[in-house]
Amino acid sequence: MADRGIVAVFGSMNMDLSVACERIPRAGETVGGSGFITNAGGKGANQAVAAARMGACTHMIGAVGRDAFGASLVAGLQDAGVDCDFVVHRDDVETGTATIIRCEGDNRIVLSPGANHALAGEDVARALRRLVADELDSDASEIAPAAGSVFIAQGECDLAATAEALVCAHGLGFYTVFNPAPACELPAEAWPAVDLVCPNETECQVLTGILPTDDVSCIAALKALLDKGAGAAVITLGGAGSVTLGDDGELLRMPALSSTVVDTTAAGDTFIGALAAARLEGLPL
């Protein structure tokens, strides 16, 4: 039983396959490449690892194919301290992959979601109810039995399943965090089940039509997100940190820590996972 709540993540699990080349091949052409890399990825998996490394009791809900990539992803999550009892191994679909061609400082990506789209909302809801009964030692018929726990969802899985999962988690008492990445719009009826929405500036512009570049546009964008029905909103701004609204509607800025940037891959996912872990500690937004 988790003494101070859990973090449950419903999200994508991908194997990233990356290769560098001097130029992009034309149709029917083969060019030489180098620096082939395989990396575990997927926003859900990244966020789960971040939460676990921050000390949170973290559970992954998702699906992989019954293949080598799926086995490797699950093993990596477990090595990071993430419980994978609710990761389904599917025989009818392959593990999600991202194939990346790196060329002259740019890249081109082909994403194959595979098993990431295999779970329906009821599959996730069933896992959440099991977590409430088993890990939290509570009766799923109680009012808000998961109070004090956090549920995270993003936009890389089936959107209808994501919306249904958010509604279920909210009803069970989880503090729900929705990371609309890649940018995606929830059904209107699902927004009130979002306790915190956390896009970056580009995703925010897609959702609200407002690019947050200064105090005025940040306030307008945050209010537009709240008008959708979310309980709170945080916008991440890369090197400029993040912003939210205070209780009186004033803009609150949190600057990014000064550091030497080596690689920004999964920086946003790490932010979400760390935020969820901090929530378990009772820290205010």
State where each predicted segment sits:
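Glycine-rich phosphate/adenosyl-contacting loop at the front of the ribokinase-like
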Residues: 1-63, 68-82, 260-262
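Conserved phosphate-binding/catalytic region of the ribokinase-like
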Residues: 1-7, 184-189, 215-285
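Beta-strand->loop->alpha-helix junctions that form or flank phosphate-binding loops
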Residues: 10, 35, 61-66, 84-95, ...
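Alpha-helix C-terminal capping segments
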Residues: 49-57, 102, 277-282
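Conserved phosphate-binding/catalytic loop of the ribokinase/pfkB sugar-kinase fold
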Residues: 89-90, 100-150, 155
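Conserved beta-alpha-beta core of the PfkB/ribokinase-like small-molecule kinase fold
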Residues: 125, 132, 139, 149-220, ...
